[in-house]
């Protein structure tokens, strides 16, 4: 059975990591000196936090990296018992081989409960001589200040377009698939700097066709073309509510798009609309209100239809 491409092409060391040059440079410095503080990696999903932690461990420990590295996903194991058992049991034992310390990687650590984070803080203090913690999170504000103050903080930004394109082209060549420019542009659009999403979309598209264009990508990603979203929005802004709503229903039924997906794509199109700055402000406010109501459980079609209606009377 073929491995997912995100695993098949995951970097094996820090030299292979795509993007984040400054962060990688600092991590290599830790490897060279065999010394590092506790680390906190923050950033949106798919930008390389887990990969950086794994590559750091492999470069630090070589063949014994699995014995000296513990990875836990805090969103699955988020309670205080995990800190008291798995984490503490691993932290209290000495490193294997000539490693100066062990590394515990807590992925999605912002999902840990407050009690678990306080227990973690005490564990970090107690075993700091033989163990280092690498915490990964999407929202650093959810990490308690005492933990943040004990860590060197690394902020991972969404990957640049050139980094995404370079990596996707290398994978395409190895898998003998042809990605047209329109297909590559579509992958960049739907992934929004998320390498994991970009590779997954590429693999899904390759399962449909060995010649990948924008039609294939938007279909497998369940996203509308930007020009279709723009067309719907402009119809609504010009007071053609019925036509705009028909376009909306087409997107939701034919493309299987969720209300949340459509809201995000409308929001991304706002800067490109030929309306005044004041109208853009009012439109963003209406989009925010619609998004809030959908998240709270309101009917998606009704809320999006109401948003299209408001567009026709923007001031």
UniProtKB/Swiss-Prot annotation:
Listed GO biological process terms: DNA repair; DNA-templated DNA replication
Query: Per UniProt, what is one Pfam family of this protein?
Result: Rep_fac_C
What InterPro entries does UniProt report for this protein, alphabetically?
AAA+_ATPase, ATPase_AAA_core, DNA_pol3_clamp-load_cplx_C, DNA_Rep/Repair_Clamp_Loader, P-loop_NTPase, Rep_factor-C_ssu_arc, Rep_factorC_C, RFC_lid
Alphabetized GO MF terms:
ATP binding; ATP hydrolysis activity; DNA binding; DNA clamp loader activity
- Any single GO CC term annotated in Swiss-Prot or TrEMBL for this entry: DNA replication factor C complex
Where does the chain bind ATP? 43-50
Q: Which HAMAP family does UniProt cross-reference here?
A: RfcS
Q: Which family does the UniProt entry place this protein in? A: Belongs to the activator 1 small subunits family. RfcS subfamily.
Subunit note: Heteromultimer composed of small subunits (RfcS) and large subunits (RfcL).
Task: Describe the function of this protein.
Answer: Part of the RFC clamp loader complex which loads the PCNA sliding clamp onto DNA.
Q: What is the protein name for this chain?
A: Replication factor C small subunit
Q: Per the UniProt entry, what species is this protein from, by scientific name?
A: Methanococcus vannielii (strain ATCC 35089 / DSM 1224 / JCM 13029 / OCM 148 / SB)
Q: What taxonomic lineage is listed for the species of origin?
A: Archaea, Methanobacteriati, Methanobacteriota, Methanomada group, Methanococci
């Amino acid at each position: 059975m073929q491995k997912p491409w995100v695993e098949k092409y995951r970097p094996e060391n820090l030299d292979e990591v795509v993007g984040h040059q400054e962060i990688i440079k600092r991590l290599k410095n830790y490897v060279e000196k065999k010394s590092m503080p506790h680390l906190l990696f923050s950033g949106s999903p798919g930008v390389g936090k887990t990969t950086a932690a794994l590559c750091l461990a492999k470069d630090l420990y070589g063949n014994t990296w699995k014995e000296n590295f513990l990875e836990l996903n805090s969103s699955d194991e988020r309670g205080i018992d995990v800190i008291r058992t798995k984490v503490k049991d691993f932290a209290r034992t000495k490193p294997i081989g000539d490693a100066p310390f062990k590394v515990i990687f807590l992925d999605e650590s912002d999902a840990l409960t407050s009690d678990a984070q306080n227990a973690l803080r005490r564990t970090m203090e107690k075993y700091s001589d033989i163990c280092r913690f690498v915490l990964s999170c999407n929202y650093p504000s959810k990490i308690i200040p005492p933990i943040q103050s004990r860590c060197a903080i690394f902020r991972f930004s969404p990957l640049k377009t050139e980094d995404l394109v370079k990596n996707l082209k290398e994978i395409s060549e190895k898998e003998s698939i042809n990605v047209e420019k329109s297909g590559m542009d579509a992958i960049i659009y739907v992934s929004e700097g998320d390498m994991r999403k970009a590779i997954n979309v590429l693999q899904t598209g390759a399962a449909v066709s060995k010649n990948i264009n924008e039609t294939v990508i938007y279909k497998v990603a369940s996203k509308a073309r930007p020009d279709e979203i723009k067309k719907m929005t402009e119809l609504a802004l010009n007071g053609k509510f019925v036509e705009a709503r028909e376009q909306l229903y087409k997107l939701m039924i034919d493309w299987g798009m969720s209300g949340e997906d459509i809201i995000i794509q409308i929001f991304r199109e706002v800067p490109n609309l030929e309306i005044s700055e004041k109208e853009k402000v009012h439109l963003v406010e209406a989009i925010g209100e619609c998004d809030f109501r959908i998240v709270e459980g309101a009917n998606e079609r009704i809320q999006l239809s109401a948003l299209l209606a408001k567009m026709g009377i923007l001031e």
